[in-house]
Design a protein with these regions (language model features):
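Structural alpha/beta surface segment adjacent to cysteine/selenocysteine redox centers
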Residues: 1-80
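C-terminal cap of thioredoxin/glutaredoxin-like
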Residues: 1-6, 73-158
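A local structural motif
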Residues: 12-13, 85-92, 176-178
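Extracytoplasmic/secreted cell-surface and envelope-processing proteins
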Residues: 22-26, 64-65, 128-131, 258-259, ...
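Stable alpha-helical elements in mature extracytoplasmic
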Residues: 32-39, 48, 52, 71-78, ...
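Glycine-rich, acidic and aromatic/proline-enriched surface loops and short helix-turn segments
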Residues: 45, 58, 80-85, 255-256, ...
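Short clusters of hydrophobic/aromatic residues that line enzyme substrate/ligand-binding pockets
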Residues: 63, 93, 127, 231-235, ...
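Cyclophilin-like peptidyl-prolyl cis-trans isomerases
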Residues: 136-273
């Protein structure tokens, strides 16, 4: 999360909520869950919530097997290490206010129906259990969400002259790449490509998918391979062939799902015809 906040400092608001897995007196879960939450909150009273939070997370192996009494001693020692007023921390740690706070956090989680931790909600949507919370996935969701602000609501109007020859130049780190656009063969694709280029869609993007001996793919500002302009247009099947290196075509996720992504062949690819 720290990496995400660093990458998107003006676009993410991170809200943390405790869900200490306390359990019930009859069926307790984690004997140190409540005290962990209380420790972070006690440190927070001195402006060091995240320092204690991070120490608990990073050093879990050191304290997870301790007794509750020894864990409390560990917390007090850690409070001194991170620069807290230890006496105040010790008083706050087991105060009735924080004991009640931890219990309420558990009760609220139960009422809400939380299944466990970690539990993540992004813009009101629960993060699916079958998708890992690794950085790439989280960053992709942020990038795709931000892309929505740039997307269009419909296909561009047809403005090109299908009798003319159009040439586009890709400016890359390796030098310029000139592309012939066949308006007579693929008017929808050419019209869309020019429209997107004129609106800065392709500025500063990368080739997010490069397969040596096959293709290099670009056209997604997020670099995830899932981004598009907000509209689709139909396939245009012509007599043109992917019979040599340097042929450009539209990349899609199935019939008639063309958008902004395109590929350039490294070698003949008759399977793409």
């Amino acid at each position: 999360m720290e990496q995400l906040l660093s990458e998107y400092p003006n676009d993410i608001r991170y809200v943390f909520r405790h869900f200490p897995l306390i359990g019930t007196p009859e069926n307790p879960f984690h004997d140190k869950a409540a005290l962990s939450a209380q420790a972070a909150e006690a440190a927070g009273k001195q402006g060091k919530f995240w320092e204690m939070h991070d120490a608990l997370f990073e050093e879990q192996r050191q304290w997870s097997s301790l007794s509750v009494t020894d864990f409390q001693a560990w917390l007090i020692e850690k409070a001194g290490e991170i620069g807290l007023n230890v006496s105040k921390f010790e008083t706050d740690l087991t105060s009735q206010a924080l004991v009640d706070f931890a219990q309420a956090a558990w009760d609220n989680g139960q009422t809400t129906g939380l299944s466990g931790t970690p539990f993540l909600v992004v813009n009101g949507n629960i993060w699916p259990n079958n998708v890992s919370m690794e950085y790439f996935n989280l960053s992709a969701v942020v990038a795709l969400t931000l892309l929505e602000e740039k997307q269009f609501t419909q296909c561009p109007k047809m403005v090109i002259d299908q009798t003319k020859q159009y040439v586009a130049t890709l400016v890359t780190e390796k030098g310029p790449v000139k592309i012939e656009l066949f308006a007579d063969k693929a008017p929808l694709a050419v019209n869309s490509f020019i429209f997107l280029a004129q609106n800065g869609w392709f500025d500063n993007i990368s080739f997010h998918r490069v397969i040596p001996g096959f293709v290099a793919q670009a056209g997604d500002p997020t670099g995830t391979g899932f981004g598009g302009p907000g509209y689709y247009f139909k396939n245009e099947i012509t007599d043109l062939k992917f019979d040599r290196p340097g042929v450009l075509g539209m990349a899609n996720a199935g019939a008639d799902t063309n958008g902004s992504q395109f590929f350039i062949t490294f070698a003949p690819a008759p399977n793409l015809d």
